[in-house]
């Protein structure tokens, strides 16, 4: 049997609904998801309006019907705590715009956060929001550093000079994305770069050296949270320098996996919470949630978060990618004189490449469909071997990289990018 014939028989069709409409189309996913503890929902490009709409409906279904209790997002770990407090009732409804002003976050995401805030007002089981990423999209040390600095000021004044020194250097790199920080890394001297890296490592080691005292005084949860903030600064530091290497043409294989290691650790850190059995929805780019290495023309770009979560928790992790057949997508290019350190082109999609999952699913005559890969027949022929990444196609063994794919017929870039 060919892949196209199998898809015709096995696909689950759905409609892209208004955020308040029902999610009946997705109820066949109950058996597929089962007791899976961590389910990741992807996107083949950032800033796509329809992907946010689809994930909003899926989020409601996962929470209301399947009992998921945590929404984990490709968003700064420290900044995420502010939004978590907000969805639990702090502040006013309109503050959400202020929390999202540091990036191209569309209205559809605000709608999701407002829904979570309203849901938590009456829910017995409150929903947690978890930012899993390095600080401020990889552009600034400060969201994490300010918290760790405050901790040292109270808990370890003797070592405060270490983080003071790091802070004085780090505040010169206060941007909104990894590419923006990398493009402006020249603002630090080579000596400052080395000193910052060294002092960040000393901050972490000092926390670990003093762990018994901190745990006794503040508790294990507080200590491990502060340590995770410190790790976020270290991974961000590495990630900025790795991106600088890629932009200059000298990047090492696998280097961009630093961010993915931290995101995977953030999810696993949350799963260790002894207070409840968490079921987590993770939302991030397809390239972060997939379970196999990211390769560009044979070059190993990244060992992704999804691969690490699969290795850590096995079949308790499920990766569901999202892509589109036609319309427009966001193509991103590092560029120094832009708002967030990259140019976003509103790229017109052409006919999908032969061998792509987009071409194969649309070739079956189905649109807006979900295809599940876990029980795919071993003798199935013509399985697609590539998927779109932003405006290009990337080789992947689809049935190993993802447990399933949602494909929508037409995508568009959110208006927020061009405001």
UniProtKB/Swiss-Prot annotation:
One of its GO terms (molecular function) is carboxylic ester hydrolase activity. One of its GO terms (biological process) is response to antibiotic. InterPro entries: Emycin_Estase, Emycin_Estase_proteobac, Hydrolase/PRTase-associated. Keywords: Antibiotic resistance, Hydrolase, Plasmid, Serine esterase. CDD domains: Ere-like. Pfam families: Erythro_esteras (PF05139). Its EC number is 3.1.1.-. Coiled coil: none annotated. This enzyme confers resistance to erythromycin through inactivation by hydrolyzing the lactone ring of the antibiotic. Erythromycin esterase type I and type II share no significant homology except for the region from 279 to 309. This is Erythromycin esterase type II.
